[in-house]
């Protein structure tokens, strides 16, 4: 489950994208398209992609303007390199602009 700073939560059952106004590129398919309210526009239109692989949750920054930072419980912040998957532990926090979500 993803719990967002906006108060929303989503159960993850596949892949998805997150952003202010996210859209898939031609030929892409996602199980979830998650729109985040962000009046300050710190979150990009299509900010990041997420999914699960071998029981691990991962994120991939979609070349967002403000980047994506992940923090595993008790760990140091890690910047997500655009276009590369980064594994996130349960309880980890993902910062996207002025918003964030927690993986539970």
What is each model feature region?
Residues 1-41, 100-103:
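Intrinsically disordered, low-complexity acidic Ser/Thr-rich regulatory segments
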Residues 1-3, 67-70:
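Short polybasic amphipathic segments
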Residues 15, 64, 85:
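ATP/adenylate-binding site constellation spanning eukaryotic-like Ser/Thr protein kinases
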Residues 18, 52, 71-104:
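C-terminal boundary/linker segments immediately following FHA domains
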Residues 18, 46-50, 57-60, 66-69, ...:
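Short hydrophobic/aromatic patches on the structural cores and recognition surfaces of FHA
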């Amino acid at each position: 489950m993803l719990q967002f700073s906006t108060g929303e939560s989503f159960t993850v059952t596949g892949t998805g994208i997150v952003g202010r106004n996210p859209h898939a590129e031609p030929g892409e398919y996602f199980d979830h398209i998650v729109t985040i309210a962000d009046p300050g526009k710190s979150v990009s239109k299509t900010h990041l992609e997420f999914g699960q692989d071998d029981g691990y949750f991962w994120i991939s920054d979609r070349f967002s303007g403000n980047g994506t930072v992940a923090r595993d419980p008790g760990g140091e912040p890690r910047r997500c390199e655009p276009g590369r998957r980064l594994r996130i532990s349960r309880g980890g926090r993902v910062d996207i602009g002025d918003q964030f979500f927690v993986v539970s």
